[in-house]
Amino acid sequence: MLDITYIRQNQDDVTAMLRNRLLESEIPRVAELLGLDRQRRELVQQADDMKALRNRVSRDIADMKKSGSGPADELIGKMKSVAENIAASDTSLKNLESAIEEILLTLPNRLHNSVPVGKSAEENVILKEQGGFDYPLDFPLKNHTELGKSLGILDFERGAKVGGAGFPVYTGKGARLERSLINFMLDTHTSGHGYTEIFPPFLVNRESLRGTGQWPKFADQVYTIEEDGLYAIPTAEVPVTNLHRGEMLDAADLPIAYAAYSACFRREAGSYGKDTRGFLRVHQFNKVEMVRFTRPEVSYEALEEIRQHAEAILLALKIPYRVLLLCSGDISANATKCYDIEVWSPAEDKYLEASSCSNFEDYQARRMNIRYRPDGKSRPEFVHTLNGSGLATSRLMVSLLEHNQTPEGKVIVPEVLRPYTGFDIIG
């Protein structure tokens, strides 16, 4: 959530940001917001004046009763009128603050000055392409769904029978390979990169979704358990970032770095017509998430570290990938800057997104009221929050299976995973 003071002082910048994000329809809401803000500040001043008057009248009544200087009926009547006006003012103020918050919750975040202006994914900037791995794929390739079926390690048909399309089943060595990927990534991030492991709830309340920015703007993408007021998490970012909601963090504890595995659930509303084969678009998938809480002045250094930690997984697995800096028209509403990491699918002949690494500055922390004191006596400030996929296994599995296939239709297990799988080949 943006600071109302920032919006008040930088209306032109906020308008330009909305235009660069292709959200021109939201621009009138800024003027509406500032109009409500003016009303709120005027009402606060009026309420303060009335409360000061009430205090003076109360003292006058007390003095008159103490001195016996005369009847206080007139002043008591005035006091009742002032009290009624204060109550009415408080009700109006509460309604104004609710209207202001409703708009603030839907406005997107600022954009970092390094984010390129663009209208679509075609204008994202390719920062890096990592290849150089020796894969002799000079034979007719099977895609991941064909490999999964022929090797008996993936069962999309039975998954669809149980939960519908987009709910895959891993079987036998496929299940072991998936679990090995998760454990390898968690071990790398905790033992190698210094993250503390978290195993979070997979169901959260609405306040948690609101805190990280999925609610209300992306409510249609979330699976809902209405009778219990709970929601299936779209990413571990939601429960893990909310661990410190409403807390004053100790500056000495910053930065805080968490790594968490979770299943992720997404309705993917509006995906009709897109390629939904196999793992290309699913409703449930597994992901290891990196989450950080930092001082504001070091958050962009932390973003680069998160990106490097995600890349380290791919380098260890010897998966070809590229890094994109997202443009203003493609970046998520909550992020100020975002890198996407895409893995190469040789059978599909295209890149697939496997990780997003984002800085949110104080956008989420303000929604969740997560603060710290730079030193013992200073005024509290909001922390900056960041996260990155480290990584999502579904798209990663596509690239891993397709790159490591043999002409005989077998799959060689990457060397770093063999201590986890207990086998070096599937098939």
From Swiss-Prot:
Binding site for L-serine: 235-237, 289, 389
Enzyme class name: ligase
CDD domains associated with the record: SerRS_core (cd00770)
Keyword vocabulary terms for this entry: Aminoacyl-tRNA synthetase, ATP-binding, Cytoplasm, Ligase, Nucleotide-binding, Protein biosynthesis
Example of a GO cellular component annotation carried by this entry: cytoplasm
Protein name: Serine--tRNA ligase
Binding site for ATP: 266-268, 282, 353-356
Pfam family, one: tRNA-synt_2b
Function: Catalyzes the attachment of serine to tRNA(Ser). Is also able to aminoacylate tRNA(Sec) with serine, to form the misacylated tRNA L-seryl-tRNA(Sec), which will be further converted into selenocysteinyl-tRNA(Sec).
GO BP terms in the entry: selenocysteine biosynthetic process; seryl-tRNA aminoacylation
Enzyme Commission number(s) from the entry: 6.1.1.11
Recorded family membership: Belongs to the class-II aminoacyl-tRNA synthetase family. Type-1 seryl-tRNA synthetase subfamily.
Gene3D superfamilies per UniProt: Bira Bifunctional Protein, Domain 2, Serine-tRNA synthetase, tRNA binding domain
InterPro entries: aa-tRNA-synt_IIb (IPR002314), aa-tRNA-synth_II (IPR006195), aa-tRNA-synth_II/BPL/LPL (IPR045864), Ser-tRNA-ligase_type_1 (IPR002317), Ser-tRNA-synth_1_N (IPR015866), SerRS_1_N_sf (IPR042103), SerRS_core (IPR033729), tRNA-bd_arm (IPR010978)
Domain of life per record: Bacteria
Assembly notes: Homodimer. The tRNA molecule binds across the dimer.
Catalytic activity entry: tRNA(Ser) + L-serine + ATP = L-seryl-tRNA(Ser) + AMP + diphosphate + H(+); tRNA(Sec) + L-serine + ATP = L-seryl-tRNA(Sec) + AMP + diphosphate + H(+)
Classification via SUPFAM superfamilies: Class II aaRS and biotin synthetases, tRNA-binding arm
Pathway of action: Aminoacyl-tRNA biosynthesis; selenocysteinyl-tRNA(Sec) biosynthesis; L-seryl-tRNA(Sec) from L-serine and tRNA(Sec): step 1/1
Domain notes: Consists of two distinct domains, a catalytic core and a N-terminal extension that is involved in tRNA binding.
One example GO MF annotation: ATP binding
Main location: cytoplasm
Location(s), subcellular: Cytoplasm
Regions crossing the membrane: none
NCBIfam families with a match to the protein in the record: serS
